[in-house]
From Swiss-Prot:
NCBIfam families named among the record's database cross-references: cat_per_HPI, PRK15061.1
Site (Transition state stabilizer): 102
Biological role stated in the UniProt entry: Bifunctional enzyme with both catalase and broad-spectrum peroxidase activity.
Catalytic activity: H2O2 + AH2 = A + 2 H2O; 2 H2O2 = O2 + 2 H2O
Highest taxon of the lineage: Bacteria
Cofactor descriptive note: Binds 1 heme b (iron(II)-protoporphyrin IX) group per dimer.
Organism, scientific name: Salmonella arizonae (strain ATCC BAA-731 / CDC346-86 / RSK2980)
Any one GO biological process: cellular response to hydrogen peroxide
Name of protein: Catalase-peroxidase
Keywords: Heme, Hydrogen peroxide, Iron, Metal-binding, Oxidoreductase, Peroxidase
InterPro entries membership: Catalase_peroxidase (IPR000763), Haem_peroxidase (IPR002016), Haem_peroxidase_sf (IPR010255), Peroxidases_AS (IPR019794), Peroxidases_heam-ligand_BS (IPR019793)
Positions bound to heme b: 267
Family classification: Belongs to the peroxidase family. Peroxidase/catalase subfamily.
GO molecular function, one term: catalase activity
Length: 726
């Protein structure tokens, strides 16, 4: 583990003064805007992962490249690698099984269900901060071991897919039968900036489980994937870790059975490494010197590798066959008396005091040791609920195998979204509830059907505001992090979404559209909801003097209630949706920051967010029908009035509540209140970046561009979950 003392500094008193004391003239050096204004709005989050950072170009099609892959040969190469021990990082017992399982586990384990961010889906373990987290010590070596294989197969396999597949092959090579593997994870080329890893400034700062439940964080300590293996705050108490384990695994959407299976399964193979104190360990990859070439944690203890390796500081081997699958974890857990001890590095762990020396040494076949366990392993024996599950798995190894296979598949695929995104020959046929399954299409509407449906919607008596609002309510649940939500499935008509306060419009509009769907029987309700938005926007554009056809791709289906996990879908309920001027809680960030958060989840750029907010305001789509931000005298017309009036210096804005959430815009001459607004409205005039964008649409020549840009951004949101079109 690295400390502040480990940070490498190339400057010293004896060096050339140019390199020592001269002004840094490099791009990006010097005091930055955020140094002066640390609360500056993070509009830059909407510019992540653009084509400018992608060396493969916007025409690269990963699914197409993957189809050219010799999948069997790749798995064969991975299997061979497992026992191809390298002298620069020798394999324990001659096998990298445990190392590759840990690499896959720690890549996927950053996922959190509360906001859908994290996970293995984009290969983020290659970048900071994850590449240098204390919990990821030595995984830099695992990735380097994979490099020759990645180099051989090139872009036919992404790093993100390769990390998880390597873990699967490791399990299979140990004799375990996995549930399957779905490829389809596309690499990105820079760190995710939108993931909130926490506010702590020091590694391994403890978080109370109750606090963890209120935040979108996946670990109980900064820099860990899950929990401190020595117990909360190094307590050494197995029972004290139970709440932390439930909190962190629960934040991933795992129940108690899945949690027990994952902990036990992950600790059936491999070992931890703690040959000596952490003071021997050098800088992490991000802080290591340039000649280290991205490798970190160089150890000065002995050879620094093999028997002398230091990773977590714990020195634990759980089972008698650490490279072969078994039920020894549970057998040892319940068979022996466990006594607290310390590793050579000083970390708290447990040893089976009454066990014979039955554990093989990883490098000396003539040596044996007693079984050892982590503090958190013993939680599975001493917590009453975990203990029941553990004993069942002890007595029924097949039940354990099945539970781990399914939990591992869920762990490694949870952030991939619907099954339609999976590719490859090992995709399981079974639909799983956490995949948000969808039925097969019942309708294939023709162009004539669509024309007739649009006419029926237009004649239904619904207003532009209602039609646009219901379509947005359906589609805007999408989360780019784990690809959940969206309009496909029409889950707006099901629990829990139909009853959300933000979706009040559904109670008025859905009965009309449901009746129309039953009468015509030509399209799914999901398609009709989106088509209603099309009709509303085309009417609003025509009223503004612009004739435009809003693109519409039919083919959505209607999910059933039994295909909808109410608890998991409840996590999609927004705290705020600035596009609809909705804010449920004032104790979570600022309104404008939550608007950025929502836009980022919808994969919108800053210009797309800007044009959508401006358009939706003049169309009157506020969730509660309020006039906040409706800066127009002609609501329902797709005009640029929002921008023109927001930037008009005739109006002076002042807050009307103590929280500074609501504002009045008064005529500077008469004092008359002309408009009301929220922070989600005024930010487009106050933030310098967003104001620059608003000015584009406020110009006299922007009307037609505004309509076209609005339609393009709108269609993007409506189709975010159309993975069937890939």
């Amino acid at each position: 583990m690295s400390t502040t003392d480990d940070t490498h500094n190339t400057l010293s008193a004896g060096k050339c003064p140019f390199h020592q004391g001269g002004h840094d003239r490099s791009a990006g050096a010097g005091t930055a805007s955020r140094d002066w204004w640390p609360n500056q709005l993070r509009v830059d989050l909407l510019n992540q992962h653009s084509n400018r950072s992608n060396p493969l170009g916007e025409d690269f099609d990963y699914r197409k490249e993957f189809s050219k892959l010799d999948y069997s040969a790749l798995k064969g190469d991975l299997k061979a690698l497992l026992t191809d021990s390298q002298p620069w990082w020798p394999a324990d017992w001659g096998s990298y099984v445990g190392l590759f399982i840990r690499m896959a586990w720690h890549g996927a384990g950053t996922y959190r269900s509360i906001d859908g961010r994290g996970g293995a889906g984009r290969g983020q373990q290659r970048f900071a901060p994850l590449n240098s987290w204390p919990d990821n010590v030595s995984l830099d070596k695992a990735r380097r071991l994979l490099w020759p294989i990645k180099q051989k197969y090139g872009q036919k396999i992404s790093w993100a897919d390769l990390f998880i597949l390597a873990g699967n092959v490791a399990l299979e090579n140990s004799g375990f039968r996995t549930f399957g593997f779905g490829a389809g994870r596309e690499d990105v080329w820079e760190p995710d900036l939108d993931v909130n890893w926490g506010d702590e400034k020091a590694w391994l700062t403890h978080r109370h489980p109750e606090a963890l439940a209120k935040a979108p964080l996946g670990a109980t300590e900064m820099g860990l994937i899950y929990v401190n293996p020595e117990g909360p705050d190094h307590s050494g108490e197995p029972l004290s870790a139970a709440a932390a384990i439930r909190a962190t695994f629960g934040n991933m959407g795992m129940n108690d059975e899945e949690t027990v299976a994952l902990i036990a399964g992950g600790h059936t193979l491999g070992k931890t490494h703690g040959a000596a104190a952490a003071s021997h360990v050098g800088a992490d990859p991000e802080a290591a010197p340039i000649e280290a070439q991205g490798l970190g944690w160089a150890s000065s203890y002995g050879s620094g590798v093999g028997a002398d390796a230091i990773t977590s500081g714990l020195e634990v081997v759980w089972t008698q066959t650490p490279t072969q699958w078994s039920n020894y974890f549970f057998e040892n857990l319940f068979k022996y008396e466990w006594v607290q001890t310390r590793s050579p590095a000083g970390a708290i762990q447990f040893e089976a005091v009454d066990a014979p020396d039955i554990i093989p040494d990883p490098f000396d076949p003539s040596k044996k040791r007693k079984p050892t366990m982590l503090v958190t392993d013993l939680t599975l024996r001493f917590d009453p609920e975990f203990e029941k599950i553990s004993r069942r798995f002890l007595n029924d190894p097949q039940a354990f195998n099945e539970a781990f296979a399914r939990a591992w598949f869920k762990l490694t695929h949870r952030d991939m979204g619907p099954k339609a995104r999976y590719i490859g020959p090992e995709v399981p046929k079974e639909d799983l509830i956490w995949q948000d399954p969808l039925p097969q299409p019942l309708y294939q509407p023709t162009q004539e059907d669509i024309i007739n449906l649009k006419a029926a919607i237009a004649a239904s008596g619904l207003s532009v505001s209602e039609m646009v609002s219901v379509a947005w309510a359906s589609a805007s649940t999408f989360r780019g992090g784990d690809k959940r939500g969206g309009a496909n499935g029409a889950r707006l008509a099901l629990a829990p979404q139909r009853d959300w306060d933000v979706n009040a419009v559904a109670a008025r509009v859905l009965p009309v559209l449901e009746a129309l769907q039953k009468t015509t029987n030509k399209a799914s309700l999901a398609d009709i909801i989106v088509l209603a938005g099309v009709v509303g926007i085309e009417q609003a554009a025509a009223a503004a003097g612009v004739s435009i056809s809003v693109p519409f791709a039919p083919g959505r289906v209607d999910a059933r209630q039994d295909q909808t996990d109410i608890e998991m879908f409840s996590l999609l309920e927004p705290i705020a949706d600035g596009f609809r001027n909705y804010r449920a809680r004032l104790d979570v960030s600022t309104t404008e920051s939550l608007l950025i958060d929502k836009a980022q989840q919808l994969t919108l750029t800053a210009p797309e967010m800007t044009v959508l907010v401006g358009g939706m305001r003049v169309l009157g789509t506020n969730f509660d029908g309020s006039q906040n931000g409706v800066f127009t005298d002609r609501p329902g017309v797709l005009s640029t009035d929002f921008f023109a009036n927001l930037l008009d210096m005739r109006y002076e804005w002042k807050p009307t509540d103590d929280a500074n959430e609501l504002f009045e815009g008064r005529d500077r001459l008469t004092g008359e209140v002309k408009y009301t607004a929220t922070r989600a409205d005024l930010v487009f005039g106050s933030n310098s970046v967003l104001r620059a964008l608003a000015e584009v649409y406020a110009c006299s020549d922007a009307h037609e561009k505004f309509v076209k840009d609005f339609v393009a951004a709108w269609v993007k949101v409506m189709n975010l979950d159309r993975f069937d079109l890939l």
